[in-house]
Amino acid sequence: AGGIAVATMPLLRERELTYILDKAQVQFALCDKALAGELAAAQAKSPALGRTIHFNDPGPDGLEALMARQSGGFRNVIPAQDDVALIAFTSGTTGQAKGTVHFHSDVLAICDCFPRSTLKPASDDIFCGSPPLAFTFGLGGLLLFPMRFGASTLLLERCPPAELLQAVQDHRLSVIFTAPTAYRAMADLAKRYDISSLKKCVSAGEHLPAATFTAWRQASGISIIDGIGSTEMLHIFISSTGDDVRPGATGKAIPGYQAMVVDDEMRPVAPGTVGRLAVRGPTGCRYLSNLEQ
């Protein structure tokens, strides 16, 4: 419809929602009816936000009822490649959460970089995982990548390790995205489930210990594809696959990206020297109304 998407986590409360609403100047909201209270409290402090529609709402003004009353026709908007598609907010681990701005071309770029070069999905794959869609790791892995390659995705409202393994068994999942802590827990549970349909397992969001990599490979027969990504870059830009996978090592810059460790003057440092990771590629890095950045 031509709008800009700003996704939020279900765990966010009034204070965090108010900050996001004001920073992004959100004008329209879709909200789960179960979470309506926190958004309503934030809306009272956010004059830019006009209409809110709730889904999972049985009432006549709920999203489902409104959709049922609409005609089948739809007039789509054709955006330019440098039109803003979404604003993703960082987790705020280094201070106040920052809004990162991504174009329509960025959305396509992440689909044609990591999955095409490293994950290599097929149209008969079924994706699933634990990261929420408001986390760009989940947005790519559970929505954008399956759509780009004509595959399918299973979206679960809750996805602790045991339920993810149950979903693999029940739905014959072939690709999963989750965090190292989940793989560690699933390694101890895997023998209780039929996970023979699994082909690819992707990890990001935190360091993948070599012990976790080994435990999961012993339990499943699958080497975890580890990756480094960021909200600013939209998805994974360093990874490895196949014979290049080594326990404890994340990998190399994927095709389309360049990465090096530099000093404070942006000069490359010698191997083994601590520095800053500099990354360049088709995505990132635009902050929303942030002069410091």
Protein language model features and the residues they cover:
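Conserved AMP-binding/adenylation subdomain of ANL enzymes
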Residues: A1, L108-I126, L133-V175, L189
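Conserved G/P- and acidic residue-centered "switch" motifs that form tight phosphate/ATP-binding loops
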Residues: G2, G92-T93, G150, G205, ...
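Short secondary-structure boundary segments
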Residues: D32-A34, N56, R158, P180-T181, ...
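Conserved pre-ATP/AMP-binding loop-to-beta segment of ANL
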Residues: H54, G59, Q70-F89, Q96, ...
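Structural core segment of the AMP-binding/adenylate-forming
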Residues: G3-L66, R172
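Conserved AMP-binding A3 loop
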Residues: A85-A109, G251
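Gly/Ser/Thr-rich phosphate-binding loop
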Residues: R148, L173-T178, A187-R246, Q258
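Conserved ATP/PPi-binding loop(s) of AMP-dependent carboxylate-activating enzymes
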Residues: K252-G256, R267-Q293
